[in-house]
């Protein structure tokens, strides 16, 4: 493909139409290679030509009319230019909602809204914008009026609320911009056990800003305020029994007229009152929401791209768009800077400058009805980069490119402490009307891999690979011309397609929507805003129904408490079965079983205030911080337990339904629903235990962990007292076992016990484990606490807390806290260590030898030698040494790599191995690595006395010149890799293990 670049030739291609808006001057940055093939650098160009692109060879304007429509606008519509219908005649409307945005209208908007709602915004009023799609799949924004926003206040005796508010109005100039009213009511405060409600005022305010103003003034006057942190969207959902995601109908939706009245860039826009809406909870299907997966390719002239440098342009943005839930193939689009050859299956839009490319991308987000946006590390790189280029280089106002006009936001909020570095600190993408899903963060949470590069994750999950293009090739391919850009474009599109495949693999969009529904929060907040807001919204709901109001915590109680502890492990190698039992949902069931809650708690020194309570009315827990009491269910119901009961009953019903459903789409939604409930249940304990949280109560959290420890200890005592005869009584049958058969707990980890079943065979343990766990549940605990048999190991290497390796009865190897594939180890060491582990876990003779070694002192092993079976391990070590000595290990298997994280001049020490290699490459006048490149190196044979770093060499150079490796150094890594997993055989000391392994390795005398 080719086109005339309008900024490099004196020619006008588009017919001049009558101007619909004032002429605007644009400054563009043009790559020099557009005029001189292969040239680096850029040139600025200023003109009044509007943004354009080329589709094929046809020049196409990007913006239409007054700029509120673009080439992506469906049917020529786009926002403020058109209306949803004629007149203000109400119509019936059915629509699905995926996002809720809160905004404030002032009286200056009266001409834009139907007459019946004008008084609601004088002098100002809250409007909720419900974004979604209609039943015929058209994008829609429904502006909801008359949703009341309120908080509660308790006024000290002797003071009048009227007087306090008037005083507040005199002290604040902005007071006239809002309106308020109040009513007297009675409520209980959700802080501790309380029998009688107390008099409070419910204060209604026209906006959240006005709530803050009133609350600030009343607090300063000595009043106590409640629920000032509850926004209008949350009131809308909770007070009306609505949802943040799902189907609604409206009997009287008034079409919003076109022109300046339009307040969104959806195809349709309506106004209605909150009371006109009805939510359809039983309908679970989705409309055709669009999911956009995008990726950018940048030019990094001096290493890693820097968005503030003019030369570091965005070269391409690939956009793969999928209609969620449909079987249609996704639409692949490439926004390309410069000319580009055709790419099969891809729509190529050629842009004469980066500014045109940015306009094309941002108008796509605004006008192409995109509801979900995904990518890989878009929170930390892609979105910040395009935003910085647009705002810092071109001074674009990105608020003009979201789905709404009022309360528009298009930003990335970076964490305050982002010193963790690239791809480590997590930022929040905030684009009004768009749900961002960063699949890098999702994959980090769901997977356990040696690295989380897209190529690695895609290979693991969907069996696909990236296109083979090194980012070092990007500048060359771009300047090569249309053919090079096409190759780069295919690479870019493939990345976006892989990310979309990952999203569909995990069904993340469905999962977060189900969590949003359960937690009563907007979908866009699920991935970024943590667990606290989920539980808070639900607690607010159930508390309101029971006549409670929630205090606004000031975080004065910041003392810590003893968290979950473990039963210390007994390290060693266990060659007889180890049964692992765990408590199903331990912390939630403790809350349920013991009626724990703010509403049932009585601090130890306040029991005297409740003389009507007898000893049988409450349960006492002697905590490290002092006693605390919780009243029993017949006196007061735990609101937290009520939440958990409802959620778990719903999850049970969903799982029953799941077993009978065959439709895959329905199965996916049901599965994500039950998963959402599980995740939210597990967040309840954490909600109370975070001192800086929304409503912390460390006494509750401490009680939960205290009871959890007590349950583990009781279980340990009970199981260790079960004899073969006792087991026969429990099972109602005798189990053939060794005379000295016994059960011993060798490790306890928060909610699980590792039970060494000495004298029993693995298949026997598998046969009776469920019955044993059920018996312990009935004997020791109250409903709904339940102990379950989780798994059985045939043999187990137990190292330390949270570090073990076990061979399950299915012959699958399970590792916890032990990573054989690490960035700090080369492939040769990893593979040798894995071979030793497989031998120890899989060979009966070696297993028996390992068990005997555990019972021997290190001195005894050195004096008498290891058991014969263990010599097979020594053979592997000796074989690895011979391979190193004879230079038979490929250089690639001996290579390490370290990232060049900053310019070479910024390093304080240059003796790091990868920096030594950097300087060697520089001395040889070879191409230098760039910032954020991983520099590979091997350690090669050198004269004795040299520093280890000086032994570092470029792997390619070492292979080319057949330089032998540093044998002793690599063998030492092999020894310590093996010692790391075998330390439990040698008094659980890795240094002693390494000494023993060296002692029996067959090394030449000069190497000992």
Swiss-Prot record:
It is an enzyme of class 2 (transferase). The keyword Chloroplast does not apply. InterPro entries: DNA-dir_DNA_pol_B, DNA-dir_DNA_pol_B_CS, DNA-dir_DNA_pol_B_exonuc, DNA-dir_DNA_pol_B_multi_dom, DNA/RNA_pol_sf, DNA_pol_B_thumb, DNA_pol_palm_dom_sf, DNA_pol_type-B. GO terms for cellular component: host cell nucleus. GO terms for biological process: DNA-templated DNA replication; viral DNA genome replication. Its EC number is 2.7.7.7. SMART domains: POLBc. It is found in: Host nucleus. One of its GO terms (molecular function) is DNA binding. PROSITE patterns: DNA_POLYMERASE_B. Its main location: host cell. This is DNA polymerase catalytic subunit. The gene is 9.
